[in-house]
């Protein structure tokens, strides 16, 4: 099952809940399990400026998401409310704390809960699944040391030949982004995340293409990163798009073998 790629932005403060609300223990499906794999290497799991890092989650392992969930829920100012068994009903309460010009952005608890919800109903997430999930955390180059390691989103990828929505008559791609979720508060986070993804797949050619299917409301955001609509697109609700970073030197460059997103 391939779902449309969307961007979700969560506000930095939700006034309906207080940080004293009692968290609700999450329930999740047996497939919603993973462990963090060891980093691929210092040079290939982050963007060239170390603003964000990505870490693979291994769906073939039967360990639960406890490490990720525990780390997310331990952050100051986050409270989980809701249950994961019968539908989406989660909120994350974030204290209205500021760091430099950014709001406190690690709504990791909500993102983790949403990931569990996604996996709960996707039967193709089995031990032999071709999906790869990358957790996204803030890196040492973010500029605010206290935030290093905070979860800000995740990316789900598929090999280029796997997505049903990308037929052979469309431009040839090397990697498909099936899901991309991030939070507000980190300037240009989406570009940094894609740069980190490019570096994680360093075995792909320099002129690689990344494909995705975006909701029409998010297409302009991806266009700003250099993504182009496929010429044959007729679906008005979704837009299949692809990015060739090498064709956009004003946005993307390589230094010492690492992709860098040039917008600050």
Swiss-Prot record:
A GO-annotated cellular component: membrane
Main location per the UniProt record: membrane
UniProt key word S-adenosyl-L-methionine: no
Listed transmembrane segments: 182-198
Localisation per UniProt entry: Membrane
Membrane topology term: Single-pass membrane protein
Keyword Kinase: no
Keywords for this protein: Membrane, Transmembrane, Transmembrane helix
UniProt family annotation: To E.coli YjiC.
Protein's UniProt name: Uncharacterized protein YjfZ
Gene: yjfZ
